[in-house]
Amino acid sequence: LSAITPPSFKWSFLGPKYWLTWIGVFVLYAITWLPLPLIRRIGAGTGRLVGLIVPKRVKVAKRNIALTYPELEVSRVDALTRENLRRAGMALFETAMGWWWPGWRIRRCFEIEGYEHVEAAMAQGKGVFGLALHNMNLEFACRGLGYTHPAIAFYRKHNNPLVDYLQYHGRARSNKYMIHKRNAKALISALDSQELCLYLPDQDYGRSQSIFVPFGGVKETATSTATLMFARRANCIPMIFTSQYTTKGYKVKIYPPMPELAEMETRAALTHLNTQVATIVAEQPESYLWMHKRFKTRPNDTDASLYD
């Protein structure tokens, strides 16, 4: 089967090995019942605490922002880093909200912009290859999107079996099913069947799976070629999806189709895609996942790290 077999609850989850996990789960669950403005305030405070606990991640975020936007003054980079840290703290609670909030509460603070692009693709008999940008609130956004159009996505198993159980079933609440992260054929099959499939094109997957094209101010950024493989082999139309904050709550924004990706030469296509991604990230740069080393992989082993 292409879909991952849902993990089952095990009585061993009640043993001492998982007690600390359960404490964290109960605290998160309790906080999710608070009003959203209060949850956001708690999240911001948590983000500041995270900055004290893992200062290396703060340093990585600051470096990524400075590399991507070399035109920014140091004060602006510092301000964006602080806000990104607050959003990182909020992401912990947004994940819990995405897993456990009742549907009525999600619908009340969630909206979708650009869904007509999905409808148009489906009317043409095409699948939708949703290129989802790795924003902090992605977990919550996927849950909200599922109430309008259930999606399919790759799944990476969590190392903690209890968290994996909660994570899988939380993500599956409003979506169709999930595919093992290495099962490319299953994703292509789903796209050929006119499904909406979500894929993260903006991560560093290593030198062997990438070519180096510009992203913002970094002229040689490892960019996955798998994105084009799916766009070319499947009966689909690619389009970018992003999740954004609003005064009301959250929004998934869907951008115009990019059928040209499948026709362009590989380097030109990925350069074009990265240009679009960087432009969209700049709409709410404080929400992007800057804390991972996006520019870790360099073209050659002898190249100096951008993080030293």
Region roles according to the model:
Residues G103-C109, Y115, N135, N159, ...:
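Generic secondary-structure boundary/loop-capping signal
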Residues S2-A132, L166-N175:
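Membrane-anchoring hydrophobic helices of lipid-metabolizing enzymes
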Residues F26, V60, E116, F140, ...:
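Short Gly/charged-rich anion-binding patches and loops
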Residues T46-R48, G103, A151-A153, A172, ...:
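A short, structure-level motif marking secondary-structure boundaries and short turns
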Residues Q124-R182, R207-I211, K219-E220:
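Catalytic core of membrane glycerolipid acyltransferases/transacylases, capturing the structured
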Residues S2-T5, I53, R76-R82, M122, ...:
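Non-catalytic C-terminal accessory region of glycerolipid acyltransferases
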Residues T95-A96, H134-L138, I280-E283:
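Juxtamembrane/interfacial segments around transmembrane helices
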